[in-house]
């Protein structure tokens, strides 16, 4: 429940189309990790010991966070503009987590839910967390989950609301691509992301509504405070929201990912979607009416109940069969919808040099399956022993990042010239 992210700044920009240099939109990554009993795959409450060691290490003291559960630790990354830098830091931190797991005789896993769970979790000793337990009561018994959160820098909250509106139609697909929680309390749920289903119990969850502008967003959030356990704005649990203390938009739909490559793929796609939305606004659109006709149709024509249903569908099927296509509002072969997303953000991926590695990782994802598919295969083949081997092989596996040189593209100057903001 802690945050780290990235900020951007930008001034007025002409509407004339010019040749511009590659954008450097900033981003930050929050990864949550479980420590698990290797014999039962239930959470193991050793995170405080790990935190105390990393919190005094100069390399990690600013990016290591306690989390809600006593079996969790969080890496809240530094601010990045380059995926290769992010890959290096994610891999290094995961190596630390894996090493500490070995010291304490437990397994470290980056998964959305533990394969098995205690009747009620051990909570980190923090007054705010204890208040959440009091307010949410029985919901907390099943709130044993880890997520991946991606912060992307925005030049203003108006741009942020425009981006929020523009990315809503893609949330079902991003949910399908990032599903990594098929197991719960010792059985296969049949879902790719059981965490997504569990989170629907909270007062605010799933796809956020559309907003007309930043003032509308802020007014409606304030109305939620004090209702249904929403004691503060950090408890707004939509799949995507604006940060309240950083100039970022925060994606929250993803389960914690098995490998750093899985994380980097989601981060690159989230950044590209935000860049696309910001560029559309700077080309003459508004938060509620992007100038680009395709983006506008994606944002306006899909009713909230359809997006909500599509997210549940994605949580169930992952990429195994079909996926929700935001261009048609219907289901289509999952691989086709993934490639539609790549087409949608092709220019943005090229401008940051991420296109080649994203395409490579997408092909790997479509070939090998999501984290949920890989967990399910290990579980079905060898039970707990199979999961133990999978987690050991993936927690600190070396990342694969093939980064091409950024390319200048024709368009208005980007609103995403970066200026990092510490958390």
Which residues are covered by each model-predicted region?
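Short, surface-exposed, charged/polar-biased interaction segments
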Residues: 50, 54-57, 89, 96, ...
């Amino acid at each position: 429940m802690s945050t780290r992210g990235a900020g951007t700044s930008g001034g007025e920009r002409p509407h004339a189309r010019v040749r511009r240099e590659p954008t450097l939109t900033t981003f930050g990554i929050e990864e949550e990790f479980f420590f698990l009993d290797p014999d039962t795959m239930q959470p193991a409450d050793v995170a405080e010991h790990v935190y105390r060691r990393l919190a005094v290490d100069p390399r990690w003291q600013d990016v290591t966070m306690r989390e809600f559960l006593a079996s969790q630790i969080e890496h809240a990354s530094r601010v990045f503009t380059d995926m290769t830098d992010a890959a290096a830091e994610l891999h290094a931190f995961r190596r630390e987590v894996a090493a500490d797991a070995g010291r304490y005789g437990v397994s470290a896993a980056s998964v959305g839910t533990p394969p098995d769970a205690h009747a009620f979790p051990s909570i980190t000793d923090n007054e705010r967390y204890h208040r959440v337990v009091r307010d949410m009561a029985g919901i907390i018994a099943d709130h044993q989950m880890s997520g991946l959160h991606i912060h992307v820098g925005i030049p203003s909250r108006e741009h942020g609301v425009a981006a929020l509106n523009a990315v809503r139609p893609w949330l079902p697909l991003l949910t399908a691509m990032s599903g990594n929680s098929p197991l719960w309390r010792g059985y296969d749920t049949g879902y790719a992301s059981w965490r997504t289903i569990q989170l629907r119990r909270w007062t605010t969850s799933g796809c956020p509504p559309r907003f007309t502008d930043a003032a509308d967003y802020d007014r409606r959030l304030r109305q939620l405070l004090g209702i249904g356990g929403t004691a503060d704005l950090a408890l707004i649990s939509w799949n995507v929201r604006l940060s309240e203390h950083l100039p970022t938009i925060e994606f929250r739909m993803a389960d914690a990912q098995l490998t750093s490559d899985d994380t980097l793929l989601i981060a690159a796609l989230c950044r590209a979607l935000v860049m696309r939305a910001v560029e559309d606004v700077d080309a003459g659109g508004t938060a509620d009416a992007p100038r680009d006709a395709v983006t506008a149709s994606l944002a306006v024509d899909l009713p909230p109940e359809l997006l909500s249903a599509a997210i549940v569908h994605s949580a169930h099927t992952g990429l195994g069969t079909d996926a929700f296509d935001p261009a048609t509002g219907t289901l289509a072969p999952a691989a086709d919808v993934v490639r539609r997303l790549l087409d949608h953000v092709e220019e943005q991926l090229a401008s940051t040099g991420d296109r080649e590695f994203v395409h490579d990782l997408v092909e790997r994802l479509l070939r090998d399956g999501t984290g949920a598919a890989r967990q399910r295969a290990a579980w079905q083949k060898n039970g707990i022993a199979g999961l133990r081997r999978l987690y050991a092989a993936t927690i600190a596996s070396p990342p694969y990042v093939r980064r091409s040189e950024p390319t200048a593209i024709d368009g208005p100057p980007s609103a995403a010239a970066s200026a990092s903001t510490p958390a």
